[in-house]
Amino acid sequence: MRRIFLWINFVLASLIVLLIFLQAYFITAYIAGAGEGALDAHGFTGFALIHGAELLVFLTAFGAWPRAWRWIGFTFFLFVLGTVQIFLTPVEERTNGWLHGLHGLLALVVMVIAAIIAHRGMRDLGLRRASPGGDAGTAPPQPMP
């Protein structure tokens, strides 16, 4: 059962990383004049998809890493930071560019944290390449003269 939770957690954390790139594209398209549709896509991607995935990454961490409280806390930090990042979205009535600039900066931090979580899941699932040298019974290749 743990392996199922690891897979779900790994896929969701990886999806967060990919969706943040997509979200950056949407906001850049909006700034470049693509219209309100790009801004709506940016908002939907961030709130519904990314923030929902952040919550699920936290919840699946309980099954993926049972009783690894520091690691579960790290996934909770991803969710909390994502929530703070959403609240830093500029509102049309009041704007403080210096404060709301943290919205974009924290998106990058969320992406890095999600990548760290995905990497841990990849490692625990055994999806990384084997280290050079092979098994203990095989000798490493000899250099050519």
Task: For every predicted segment, state its role.
Residues 1-145:
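Polytopic transmembrane helical bundles with strong interfacial aromatic enrichment
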